[in-house]
Amino acid sequence: MERIKELRNLMSQSRTREILTKTTVDHMAIIKKYTSGRQEKNPALRMKWMMAMKYPITADKRITEMIPERNEQGQTLWSKMNDAGSDRVMVSPLAVTWWNRNGPVTSTVHYPKIYKTYFEKVERLKHGTFGPVHFRNQVKIRRRVDINPGHADLSAKEAQDVIMEVVFPNEVGARILTSESQLTTTKEKKEELQGCKISPLMVAYMLERELVRKTRFLPVAGGTSSVYIEVLHLTQGTCWEQMYTPGGEARNDDVDQSLIIAARNIVRRATVSADPLASLLEMCHSTQIGGIRMVNILRQNPTEEQAVDICKAAMGLRISSSFSFGGFTFKRTSGSSVKREEEVLTGNLQTLKIRVHEGYEEFTMVGRRATAILRKATRRLIQLIVSGRDEQSIAEAIIVAMVFSQEDCMIKAVRGDLNFVNRANQRLNPMHQLLRHFQKDAKALFQNWGIESIDNVMGMIGILPDMTPSTEMSMRGVRISKMGVDEYSSAEKIVVSIDRFLRVRDQRGNVLLSPEEVSETQGTEKLTITYSSSMMWEINGPESVLVNTYQWIIRNWETVKIQWSQNPTMLYNKMEFEPFQSLVPKAVRGQYSGFVRTLFQQMRDVLGTFDTAQIIKLLPFAAAPPKQSGMQFSSLTINVRGSGMRILVRGNSPIFNYNKTTKRLTVLGKDAGPLTEDPDEGTAGVESAVLRGFLILGKEDRRYGPALSINELSNLAKGEKANVLIGQGDVVLVMKRKRNSSILTDSQTATKRIRMAIN
């Protein structure tokens, strides 16, 4: 009580009130706040206050021998007074200026190498062009973007091992460099940094920038590749944007872009083959992008795109848990559903079997040009809030959401039959049938949907069936918003499974991706994509198929030759001859094949008629299922360069030209490689010279295994027997001599014996 009285008494005095309201009361608290702990509480103020002093810097005593006491203007650079509490010298900021101008210069050769990413950025900005500034509302959506251009794609752990190996090679610690990219990077960097004086820690930081992809979740309206993100602060504000064209590319963006193109091409091609999954894997493993194996890029590159994710799933890698429909990425943000098969009738009374999602769910939909929030119940769209770049993009998003909702009025809006097929001529599943139908023409869908009057809500307006905005009415449940919907931020990856038709499912069996979702957009890759698989030969058109087919035969001629003489059927069935068939007119494929196979059989039967160039030239024609018509051809037609061109059965033509003197083959004027004829072509009896040291025992004997080529004979042990393929495609049984002395006589007897053995 006493205290309270005392306080009341004090408060009655006006001075007390003034002190308490106008002045800082507890100085101790404030002093404590700014002095406790090592952390500087107001760094900007501290800096200003320090720099106002004459000697704000302290330095080691040795500095006095390296810097004069006064500069050219006679200003003092350091004080003779010691710094209180340490044996350091107090130094003026002017000393820094003096040092920068007159101090020792070390070698700068390593700077561009260490600060590579910075030097490259300067070049890009120097050559970039900034356009006009436009003031307009910016629809930004947060996306996961790559923020440092010019990096490799190592994982944090891989990069850490490389950095330790480069910067601290003698430190103890288990480091295992396994991947190709780790080994090449380590080797390169060690060479670059010999004799480097820059502090190891700095080098380590800079290497990290170069090796690891750094991503941030940032609001973006416009380009998302790293060369745009590095100038994000210059190109878009809340209500303005500035046009910008980068002055150069960064390899990481090129890799991402080329990877997407390669993956799309591969998925599209795999879809039409007999076993899509096996074909896809074969192509991924045999493709290189910018000289790096595609499978290595897939393992390290976090790009999320439908085709890329299908390739990753095929390789057993984890992918994002969101799913794709109609080119939009759907992510369920709340609710749940169970799936049930249901039969529905279209407006054309066609029956469709659809998998209905029963239950209330909310999704975000993110596309390249539009985003949306979708709330739905069983076969009912409750609300759809869309934002997009333009009318077209908004319409696309609305169509996808309406189809996804599976509402009855959408299914009843179908006019005509649904019979869309994929590239392999298989019918699409019902949901994609509906989607394709309305993507072609959505008029009936929008007209049938129904409209409602709307309340005035900030930032939202209605949209009518003809896609015009309105503040009074809107299509039922649909609203247009000025605000974009952020991409799903989590980078969580899940285990998925893939079936042979390339449908990717999560562990609960939900389909996340299928080839129908792969974009048909064509683009030109920034980095060279080398598809070694014969399945991709046709990607560059008929000429490429032609050249590649002949190059493949030449490269594998030794094996092809043996198969040609021993097991032709197996040879004709090789997948490498598949693309070639599309060049041969359908009507004559079978006749050409029958004719060429008969011709080859005669070559095998008649001594001295083996002709390397002719076999190579005609071989691809023999791959089609043959028709025995007994027809003879002097030339065969193939469709290249937009018309039928003739290839002569005997002799050269513009398509296939073998130059006997240079021993090179040109296909359509392009060099297809060196072609070595058998030494005996056109000259009988040369086999005898080749078979010196071997005794010819007679006709081929299957018990001694498949025929060897003459080059493989050298591996035989003395006294060992083998079948051997000699010049004219004939096979004889030989034995390697036990003594060398009799080799000379071999040549004479060989010729006679071969004739006897064959006849």
Swiss-Prot record:
Effect annotated for changing K190A: No effect on replication or transcription
Entry's Gene Ontology molecular function annotations: RNA binding; RNA-directed RNA polymerase activity
Gene Ontology, cellular component aspect: host cell mitochondrion; host cell nucleus; virion component
Documented effect of changing F130Y: Enhances viral replication
InterPro entries assigned: Flu_PB2_2nd (IPR049110), Flu_PB2_6th (IPR049114), Flu_PB2_C (IPR049115), Flu_PB2_CAP-bd (IPR048298), Flu_PB2_middle (IPR049111), Flu_PB2_N (IPR049106), INV_PB2 (IPR001591), PB2_helical (IPR049113)
A single GO BP: DNA-templated transcription
HAMAP family (UniProt xref): INV_PB2
Function of the protein: Plays an essential role in transcription initiation and cap-stealing mechanism, in which cellular capped pre-mRNAs are used to generate primers for viral transcription. Recognizes and binds the 7-methylguanosine-containing cap of the target pre-RNA which is subsequently cleaved after 10-13 nucleotides by the viral protein PA. Plays a role in the initiation of the viral genome replication and modulates the activity of the ribonucleoprotein (RNP) complex.
Protein name: Polymerase basic protein 2
